[in-house]
Amino acid sequence: MLNAAAVACIEQVRLGFVASVSPKGTFVVLDERKIAFAEIRSPGTISNIGHSPEVEVNFVDSFRRKGWRMRGVTQILRRGSADFEEIFPKWDALCADLSARIRAIVVIKVSEVKPLSTPPYDDGVTEAEMIALYKEKYAKMYP
């Protein structure tokens, strides 16, 4: 389900936008069918998932302007549960400074993965050209 390019995007970018809630910067790949994020300060996200466990997440490389759209069903693992404790070390290693505040881990069983890209690729722009363009844009924004 998750191919090498999608895995690399998640592992490099970490920031995934869950539809109708808020961006989560703690995503990890658990296996080829599961991704997950740490719930640190997301009561709205947890409430929304409680009402509807189906979610979509977008991961986009800001410079390449490419990414992945994933759809799946969530499972909330609460701190103290055996399932939480089993996978928690991934976040303790990734963001040790925040790990004490992680209240839950939200696992998404991925059922669909689609690539995303910006329209200039349709016109023949290369990744190298997109990266150069956005490096220049960001350099102007943040000199």
Regions found by a protein language model. Name each.
Residues M1-F37:
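N-terminal structural module
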Residues I35-A38, V106-I108:
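Short hydrophobic-aromatic micro-motifs
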Residues Q75-P143:
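C-terminal edge-of-domain segments
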Residues C9, V28, N48, D61-F63, ...:
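Sterically constrained small-residue positions within well-ordered secondary structures
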